[in-house]
């Protein structure tokens, strides 16, 4: 009986509008829901952890549904010129899609370790639709790579103006990017006045805020300015997706930033 249930599980989930697949980091589910104001959204869940969310309506598909992505976009949009951006971790490709559609002066490289996740993004999170409508790939404004983002960064020959760390396996960040070595390598591969942005998943106060403290300490040794934007400013002990910012430039801080250094 158990074997039969397991065999029927994909069919049962599909009946409920849930698409199931196997990816590098476990069982991956894609399904539709609504956000707090009733707007239809599509969610990506990998091995029991939500990894990405996208609006479903056609006029919102390239907009940003997550607060931390909006904070990152605010920083990037505040930079002059034609910033070179490295996004480590594709997931649903929310930020790359936004940059391709709305910040057309950026040139963005995205490195996703799992080709299966990129396929999910292309087919279910409107990535192919974005590439077709914006022409970003044809114009060299959005370049997709499958591989180890940490290795890609270390091998990069030219500096980036922005490095975004949005790479996760479940709830844990991928690679040594919270360590002293990670902070040093990031600094070495950023250009003058470059900015490092990261999604740090934890609380901002209390015993569950250790990850944020470690990242702030490591990057505070390498950069003049360190701050973060909490997802839950009124509930600091609640784990959330917090936007971490490190730079040595007099950059514009994102709205509601908490200055560490």
Name the predicted role of every residue range.
Residues 41, 193, 240-241:
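Active-site lining segments that contact anionic ligands and/or coordinate catalytic metals
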Residues 47-49, 165, 249:
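Generic beta-structure capping elements
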Residues 2-81, 101, 137:
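Rossmann-like AdoMet
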Residues 202:
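Active-site-proximal loop/turn and secondary-structure-junction residues that shape catalytic pockets
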Residues 210-261:
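Class I S-adenosyl-L-methionine
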Residues 61-197, 205-212, 220-222, 237:
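The AdoMet/dcAdoMet-binding core of the Class I SAM-like
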Residues 34-37, 115, 149-151, 233-235, ...:
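Residue-level detector of flexible, active-site-proximal loop/helix-junction positions
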């Amino acid at each position: 009986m158990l074997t039969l249930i397991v065999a029927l599980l994909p069919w049962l989930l599909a009946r409920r509008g849930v698409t199931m697949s196997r990816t590098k980091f476990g069982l991956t589910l894609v399904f539709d829901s609504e956000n707090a104001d009733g707007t239809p959204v599509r969610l990506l869940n990998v091995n029991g952890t939500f990894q990405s969310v996208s609006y479903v309506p056609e006029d919102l598909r390239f907009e940003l549904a997550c607060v931390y992505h909006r904070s990152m976009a605010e920083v990037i949009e505040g930079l002059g010129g034609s910033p070179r951006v490295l996004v480590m971790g594709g997931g649903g490709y929310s930020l790359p899609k936004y940059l391709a559609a709305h910040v057309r002066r950026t040139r963005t490289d995205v490195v996703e370790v799992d080709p299966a996740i990129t396929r999910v993004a292309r087919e279910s999170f409107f990535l192919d639709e974005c590439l077709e409508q914006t022409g970003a790939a044809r114009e060299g404004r959005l370049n997709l790579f499958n591989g180890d983002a940490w290795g890609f960064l270390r091998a990069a020959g030219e500096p980036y103006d922005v490095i975004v760390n949005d790479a996760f396996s479940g709830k844990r960040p991928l690679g040594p990017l919270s360590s002293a070595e990670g902070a040093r390598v990031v600094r070495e591969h950023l250009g003058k006045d470059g900015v490092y942005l990261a999604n740090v998943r934890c609380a901002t106060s209390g015993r569950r805020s250790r990850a944020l403290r470690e990242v702030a300490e490591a990057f505070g040794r390498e950069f003049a300015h360190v701050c973060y934007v909490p997802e839950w400013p009124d509930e600091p002990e609640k784990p959330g997706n917090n936007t971490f910012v490190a730079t040595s430039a007099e950059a514009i801080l994102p709205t509601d930033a908490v200055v560490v250094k």
